[in-house]
Amino acid sequence: MPRRGASPTPSEGEIDIFGSLYPGETDNANGGNGGDDFDFDGLLNNPEPGNDDTDEAFIALQQAASFRKATNLKGRTVKKGGGFQAMGLNNNLLKAITRKGFSVPTPIQRKAIPLILDRKDLVGMARTGSGKTAAFVIPMIEKLRAHSARFGTRALIMSPSRELAIQTLKVVKEFSRGTDLKCVLLVGGDSLEEQFGYMAANPDIVIATPGRFLHLKVEMSLDLSSIKYVVFDEADRLFEMGFAAQLTEILHALPPSRQSLLFSATLPASLVEFARAGLQDPSLVRLDAEQKVSPDLESAFFAVKGAEKEGSLLHILHDVIKMPVGSPEGVNNDSEKGSKKRKRGADGGSGKPTEHSTIIFTATKHHVEYLANLLIYAGFAVSYVYGSLDQTARRIQVEDFRMGKTNILVVTDVAARGIDIPVLANVINFDFPPQPKVFVHRVGRTARAGQRGWSYSLVRDTDAPYLIDLQLFLGKKLVVGQETKNPSFSEDVVVGALKRDPVEGHVEWFNKSLHESEDINALRGVAVKAEKLYLRTRNSAASQSAKRSKELVGSQGWTQLHPLFGEDVDGAEQARVDMLARISGFRPQETIFEIGGRRDKGTTEAAEVMKQLRKRITPRRQTEAKADDDFEGIGDDIPAAAEAGADSDEEEVVMDEMDVDEESDDGLEVTVTNTNSKKGRTDWRDSEVFMSYTPRTFNAAEERGYGVSSGGQDPSNFVEAARGVTMDLTNDENAKSFGEPTRSKMRWDKKSRKYVSRENDEDGSKGAKMIRGESGVKIAASFQSGRFDKWKRANRLGKLPHVGEQVRPGSASHAANLPSGVRYKHKQERAPKEADKYRDDFEVRKKRVDEAREKRVGRFRDGMGSKKELKGREDIRKARIEKEKKRLKNARPTRRK
């Protein structure tokens, strides 16, 4: 029996001399140094027993061999300490990791993989592109090892979007190469009957979106007690209100002994918002918390007007990114060179986007359709994706962009999370994100794996409060216009205007295209209506950010040329821009009721009313302005982050704490206050013994941005605050989900003329038939439609095995098939043979032939059994004779006209 390999694998400096004690064994499987690799003849010929010099020479030779470079060892690699080899992974998995191109684990992988292998619940956060997917896939494959003969799924990976689930499936397939693990993908839009077969085939790993997985669980009455490994990818998105009902039902069915893992690029420090996940003594790994975006990312924020957004977008594409018009080079040539003998699917391509590849993020799907058609009309190669698009169309559009067939991908936030597109150069935020963490996920699509990338954001005047929220969240310096020479686009938030001449030219072309294309004009009208609804429903910015945004928009730097275009600014051009800014911001001193009152010296009744109203309003405004000036004079040195948080008591305590804490330098960037202004309030606090209820380095803007339920909302929102302080003691077991009150809320229904529960409006069941799930949450009644029973009868399958039961050959789960990457389907169409009148089934066969002739299948494809549709001379002659016989037989005269 071969000797078991050491676990963990010995590091570089360790010597294994036991290999020489067993000359009959080989260490190739265990990774040791075999005896055949080196020449020991001169050393070991007739060794004298008990000779210490021989032993020392042998050990010295072994050490010298182990310290050789990997290039000198043919077919071997030197195992380095601290790498994947030191984690105790099996050989197949190490080969898959090497084949993938990974040599050294990333920080999140180095921290998370050992904790996961120790069966600890984990909450992991690291910036985008840091290898979070591999951080939970590698230990999952290490723990599962091989396919289990007992029925039941053992690992579940939940993803918020279909594209992210497909990408996770590709990673799992690459790392599980060399094993017999079965992995399935369950997303919406695919055939439900095929997914019945996937789940009946006893898969080991299930990668699914919450909605479709819940549908299959209810329809098939799945038992999830065998699941031992659960991953919530992009957990902050999954635990938002959109997936509340699905996750509540799924979590209720999972066993309490499972291992739960939560991963995302934006997670709060407090785990209270993930209480529903059922974490047991979790470990929190937050890496790069102070650096939310990649250091290789350069960002530019352009101040634009609402009517010039389309022209500004075209200016960025043409003049800044220099996007070529038309299809990318080489696309047509590659398609013509494709061989018919060797076919490759979508997964078999190399996936090489062009150096101009750009993603444009918009607010709604109506904006996606509108911009996609506009850019196609402008001559660009465009793909588009949004949530309600057909699944097949989504895959085709994304693959076209991955393979470089298109240069632009217009999407909603459905593609903002987790989608890894190699060599993506640019990200454009056409609609500014309403939450800081959404911006982090959007720009995280570029500047990945050490590559450089750019992000461009269009900021209107109404988006300025969200820009300030983002600046506070990132903790970067705000640079407006030309106030700073040579600003850092990766370290600062640089805001400025675009060049007027190119923008005006593109705006004119856009207005012309609206008159020429009725489709674009109609789509623009729909997008405008959708934007109005979007603005009413998006999260509100912080109140202090809204106040500061007025000063920011009114400043001179808001309309100055962006530093991205250089410092050489024409004086006349700048004067023209300033004049246009003054005209656009002009506010008359008189109202319409007072026009002409000074020249005519006569006062009308309306002018007199406005005069009396102005007497009352003017002193009040002067008092408010004086109070604001006094406040600014007191705290001139207060940075923007402290001003934004000055309205909450928590942040005041934090700022006072920063006065007494001189050692925490990293927190000074975020919360600093003037000690002279609050000296009277802080005298009673002893810096040695005073203990605050918040951490010293607490950043309220950051935690508010990371929040799952709040997102970027104002903490003074009454609904959120009321939910936090509500305590109900009755019927607490019937609560829908965590943190929601259980008392019934009713509303008057005009149609039924009675009070009905408001829950129907909130959970989407209004006007739809709902049923209660096992956890008490309402789910759609269509989840129990009986389609699984019909599928079993159609496939002649009996009852599925119970969880833990041994799967025997010939059973239902053994007969079902799993997707194997390449699916072969019979696509040949052949017509049946002509019916033989001497057979018993002549009529049936004749009917089949007639159906094939009618559908033009096989040899009937070109017509009635002939190769051409036109009749020949003999066919026409025979048809005339037959027609004449019928006329004579009928013996009726023809009708006279």
Curated annotation (Swiss-Prot):
Question: Where in or outside the cell is it found?
Answer: Nucleus, Nucleolus
Which family does the entry's similarity section mention? Belongs to the DEAD box helicase family. DDX54/DBP10 subfamily.
Q: Where is this motif: Q motif?
A: 82-110
Q: What is this protein called?
A: ATP-dependent RNA helicase DBP10
Claim: Disulfide bond is one of the keywords in the record: no
PROSITE patterns from the entry?
DEAD_ATP_HELICASE, HELICASE_ATP_BIND_1, HELICASE_CTER, Q_MOTIF
Entry's InterPro entries? DBP10_C (IPR012541), DDX54/DBP10_DEAD-box_helicase (IPR033517), DEAD/DEAH_box_helicase_dom (IPR011545), DEAD_box_RNA_helicase (IPR050079), Helicase_ATP-bd (IPR014001), Helicase_C-like (IPR001650), P-loop_NTPase (IPR027417), RNA-helicase_DEAD-box_CS (IPR000629)
Q: Where is the composition biased (Basic residues)?
A: 886-897
Q: Please tell me which stretches of this chain the record labels as motif DEAD box.
A: 233-236
Residues engaged in binding ATP: A126, R127, T128, G129, S130, G131, K132, T133
Domain remark in the UniProt entry: The Q motif is unique to and characteristic of the DEAD box family of RNA helicases and controls ATP binding and hydrolysis.
Assigned EC number: 3.6.4.13
Q: Which organism is it from?
A: Gibberella zeae (strain ATCC MYA-4620 / CBS 123657 / FGSC 9075 / NRRL 31084 / PH-1)
